[in-house]
Regions:
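The feature marks proteins involved in alpha-glucan
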Residues: 1-25, 50-54, 61-146, 151-159
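Short edge beta-strand/loop segments characteristic of extracellular beta-sandwich folds
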Residues: 26-33
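Conserved, mostly hydrophobic/aromatic
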Residues: 30, 145, 174, 184, ...
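Extracellular/periplasmic catalytic domains that process cell-envelope and extracellular macromolecules
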Residues: 134-139, 175-176, 251, 280
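Hydrophobic faces of well-ordered beta-strands that scaffold small-molecule active sites
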Residues: 141-143, 182-184, 256-258, 287
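Aromatic- and acidic-residue-enriched carbohydrate-binding clefts of CAZyme catalytic domains
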Residues: 156-163, 195-251, 264-284
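Catalytic domains of carbohydrate-active enzymes, especially glycoside hydrolases
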Residues: 169-188
């Protein structure tokens, strides 16, 4: 494969990881599990799930284990009409750095990697002059909630129970009880229902016991850290619904802080990048 110097220069800058789109160019960076594994990206129709195109990354595009590609957006639907998955060694791999996903199954349903097709966020959000409340710590009155649990019960009397929109509907209640700082338990995307690995029973023959799926209600595990949880969104656009919630809380003088769970394997530099993203893109007030 021949490559000109302009393309080569672009390939040498693998960050940020994931896929972004700007000025008719899709910028793709994928960190492979192994530098020797064949890998690439698969594009889908966002609505139907139909495969549009499968691409393979080339050795010349690799920096260490990271493959970098800039792709002119030609012979493809509009960016907002497509989704994608990476592939490696024949397996489909969700983008850990995705900023959004296609609509997801209801909370508590089993999901696999192929369900987590990522989407490109191309629409700008109008924050309408949003300003952080900046409540002095000595004056803060905190209130910690699980987004789903806070309004899911019928007694909450909201139109959109168990969602970010439901939290927005409860702002008058939060004001009434004097809350200045709302703390959210994990509200990023995570796989809440998993089937544990089969375990070998204590018998002479190698018989394996099929375990039932277990539910992680709280979300304290590694997740897709850049995306508000789809099951906590009434609409198909969890990013917009989350930002609407933050903006309305700020208008009412209430701060929003978030809890994250990071296993020890996540580098501190990546943690800083994630938190910075939520501050800049979602206007959250702290962690």
């Amino acid at each position: 494969m021949e490559i000109n110097m302009a393309e080569k220069a672009a390939f040498q800058n693998p960050y940020p990881l994931g896929v972004s789109f700007k000025n008719g160019i899709a910028r793709i960076s994928y960190a492979a599990a192994s530098k020797d594994s064949p890998c690439g990206i698969v594009w889908y129709d966002k609505r139907t799930g139909r495969q549009l195109k499968k691409e393979t990354f080339f050795r010349e595009e690799r920096v260490g284990r990271i493959y970098c590609r800039e792709k002119k957006w030609e012979d493809m639907p509009k960016p907002e009409e497509v989704s994608y998955l990476f592939w490696e060694d024949g397996s489909l791999v969700p983008d850990r750095y995705a900023k959004g996903f296609v609509p997801q199954p209801a909370f508590g349903r089993e999901r696999s990697g192929k369900d987590l097709k990522a989407v490109l966020l191309t629409e700008r959000y109008d924050w309408q002059g949003d300003v952080a409340p900046e409540i002095p710590m000595q004056e803060a009155i905190g209130y910690c909630i699980h987004v789903r649990g806070f309004t899911k019960h019928i007694s909450s009397k909201v139109e959109h129970p168990g969602t970010f929109a439901g939290v927005t509907e409860k702002i008058p209640y939060l004001k009434e009880i004097g809350v200045t700082t709302l703390e959210l338990q994990p509200a990023y995307e995570f796989i809440e229902k998993k089937r544990p690995e089969k375990s070998q029973t204590q018998v002479h023959a190698p018989v394996f016991e099929e375990k039932k799926p277990v539910l992680n209600y709280w979300g304290y595990e590694e997740g897709y850290y850049y995306v508000p949880k789809a099951a906590y969104s009434y609409s198909e656009d969890s990013a917009r619904e989350f930002r609407n919630m933050v903006r309305q809380l700020h208008i009412s003088g209430i701060e929003v802080i978030m809890q994250f769970y990071f296993p020890v394997e996540i580098p501190r530099t990546e943690i800083q990048e994630i938190l910075r993203y939520w501050k800049l893109f979602y206007h959250v007030d702290g962690f």
